[in-house]
Amino acid sequence: MQVTETLNEGLKREIKVVVPAKDLEAKLAERLETARDRAKINGFRPGKVPAAHLRKMYGKSFMAEIVNEILNDSSRSLLAERNEKSATQPEVIMSEDEKEAEQVLDGKADFVFSLNYEVLPAIEVKDFSKIAVTREVVDISDEEVDDQVKRIASSTRAFETKKGKAENEDRVTIDYLGKLDGEPFEGGADNDAQLVLGSGQFIPGFEEQLVGVKAGDEKVITVTFPAEYGAAHLAGKEATFDITVKEVAKPNELVLDDETAKKLGIESLERLRQVVREQIESQYGQITRQKVKRQILDALDGDYQFATPQKLVDAEFNNIWQQINFDLQQAGRTFEDEETTEEAAREEYRKLAERRVRLGLVLSEIGEKAGVEVSEEELQRAVYDQVRRYPGQEKEIYEFLRKTPDAVANLRAPIFEEKVVDHLLANISVTDKKVSKEELTAEDEDAASEAKPAKKAAPKKKAAPKKKADEGKSEEA
């Protein structure tokens, strides 16, 4: 096998490989000899089939197998010999000349192909012990826990039909028919819909206009859908709703005791408070970690500047761009609606993709040098969590993951990254700072502008007054 480097520019490489016909012929002869010992062909005794006959019957198929084996093995072995790591699977380039291919399969021509690839850049891990980050910490008050317990427990309250006008916290049962310009719109009608006034379940302005209604009332209300509403044909539009009030019910007094907790599947009120506190701690903890992680990544971003493999950047950009366009399409919005242009958005998101790839390579190198590993137990837990996301398709998803190494690698990557972050946190300066929950949950404007140069479109919701559109999540960089 003759190997010649034909391209070496930056991270780009191309090598030309020539496998002489005599080497192919030697491999074929070995395979034919092995096959002769096992071949059962009418008219010949076992092991006595002439090589020429076997070659006539199986020569081309055997040679095709040999060629494929060379292609499969060469990428790994040749890069190992060159002490290089390819950023992606090398591209195999072969002649498209059918006559030449036939000659190779007949053993009459050298097998020539090229491998085109990008190498991973060499990264020297720098001293990161001087990195300093601030970890925002929120003290969770008993009052906050109690408020959340009350909100959760309120779902267990029974309602009792009342006479008279509806007030906030009363439940109204209504039929409604939504109209745009006097014409009913898809998804804008419902019967026996139950709505607790003041819950914020419906769009702004809807519930407020039902305060004071009585059973039997018929009323037309006018509302304006939020500009970011998920259903594009309703976003920002004024609509009317014909309302028929069928019942007004008042909530029974909320009692917080062990019986209420048991209705929620928890053994006691004290345990409910504990569970709620743990949930709040977990929510705040996730926000805190993301903010700390961003500080670490920003510090690493300043310390590591190098060329990144363009194929990795292209793949990352395509993933981001696909999601952004999906979000915009679902919301029925354009880049102009988000006060930007497609060209500007592409430029910003490509920068984000390049940063992600570069920092991913840095974290990978830091983790490798530190001996960070993902255990089989951690990986199996991730597989289990992934399978659980598809009720009714568990077997199919599990089989897909079992047969698709790349899919499992995608599950492994975030686990590895978080373990590297843990390693960094244990070796850098971390200062805790007590903040309010409002300060903790306030959006980081710098992070938001980097993650989404265009305002992130809201996901699509049902074309009805129910639920305000959720804000999209920013991209982690």
Swiss-Prot record:
Skewed-composition ranges (Basic and acidic residues): 467-477
The PPIase FKBP-type domain, residue ranges: 169-254
Cellular location(s): Cytoplasm
Matching InterPro entries: PPIase_dom_sf, PPIase_FKBP_dom, Trig_fac, Trigger_fac_C, Trigger_fac_C_sf, Trigger_fac_ribosome-bd_bac, Trigger_fac_ribosome-bd_sf, Trigger_fact/SurA_dom_sf
Main location: cytoplasm
GO cellular component, one term: cytoplasm
Keywords: Cell cycle, Cell division, Chaperone, Cytoplasm, Isomerase, Rotamase
One Pfam family cited in the UniProt record for this chain: Trigger_C
Basic residues composition bias: residue spans: 454-466
Enzyme class: isomerase
Disordered, as annotated region: 435-477
Reactions catalysed according to its record: [protein]-peptidylproline (omega=180) = [protein]-peptidylproline (omega=0)
PROSITE patterns on file: FKBP_PPIASE (PS50059)
A GO term, aspect molecular function: protein folding chaperone
Record-level GO BP terms: 'de novo' cotranslational protein folding; cell division; chaperone-mediated protein folding; protein transport; protein unfolding
Entry EC number(s): 5.2.1.8
Family, similarity comment: Belongs to the FKBP-type PPIase family. Tig subfamily.
Function of the protein: Involved in protein export. Acts as a chaperone by maintaining the newly synthesized protein in an open conformation. Functions as a peptidyl-prolyl cis-trans isomerase.
Free-text comment about domains: Consists of 3 domains; the N-terminus binds the ribosome, the middle domain has PPIase activity, while the C-terminus has intrinsic chaperone activity on its own.
Name assigned to this protein: Trigger factor
Species in which this protein is naturally found: Brucella anthropi (strain ATCC 49188 / DSM 6882 / CCUG 24695 / JCM 21032 / LMG 3331 / NBRC 15819 / NCTC 12168 / Alc 37) (Ochrobactrum anthropi)
